């Protein structure tokens, strides 16, 4: 099945008239839907129109969602859980719907390419360290809009800043794999002690591990999850590194640190 995903950061750069590096918060706020960049639209208004069309027209046609106001609240609650483990009971309770309805609505959001559920990685024995997937949006700009964020300053100050950056990088990785004709299957890692790697990309029978950090300066804690995964699964790890919110990539002794701006140069 053909997936028409939002643009990549590299594709968005083709619409820019300046060679100046983009502002990270503005990138997250604007998102990557082609029409916004092609026509130079105001992202807040364009995303409002997009969501209204999706809810009011498309949902009436493709699904029996009768309580549109409650469904909209449900989607906004999903945005508030960006980057978190999916808990349908909690999500349903907060939205005022049953677990069954919450599951049906999540499935609907998946099939209409609004949200993506990133599964946990499991060993060859089938043992999962956690069972729940993590929730992300196909377009981080839509997540920002659903959260009520309307300016880059609001995005940069929001408590979900790190999760929104993580969402952005994970979707860039998915688009990169699909554009290269590879499987979109990706995972995250979390062990019983809570050590986590944000993204595992299959490379043959092994994994490339990526830790994602929104901070503009490198912190030694950024490497904790990578070190844990390497220690526990040395035969699985083929390579790894950190993608962070700083402007300059760095070569560290154990793990390379890549600036998010390097994604502009992807083919």
Region annotations inferred by a language model:
Residues 1-10:
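A short helix-turn-beta junction within AAA+ P-loop NTPase domains corresponding to the substrate/partner-engaging
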Residues 17-53, 61:
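Amphipathic alpha-helical "lid/sensor" segments that cap RecA-like P-loop NTPase cores
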Residues 41-207:
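Accessory nucleic acid-recognition modules appended to NTPase machines
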Residues 178-179, 228-236:
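Arginine/glycine-rich "motif VI" loop of SF2 helicases in the C-terminal RecA-like domain
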Residues 190, 213, 243-244:
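Short beta-strand/turn micro-motifs composed of small residues
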Residues 212-220:
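Short beta-strand-loop-alpha-helix junction that forms the active-site gateway
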Residues 223-232, 243-246:
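Catalytic core segments in nucleotide and nucleic-acid processing enzymes
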Residues 245-267:
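Domain-level recognition of nuclease-like catalytic cores that cleave nucleotide substrates
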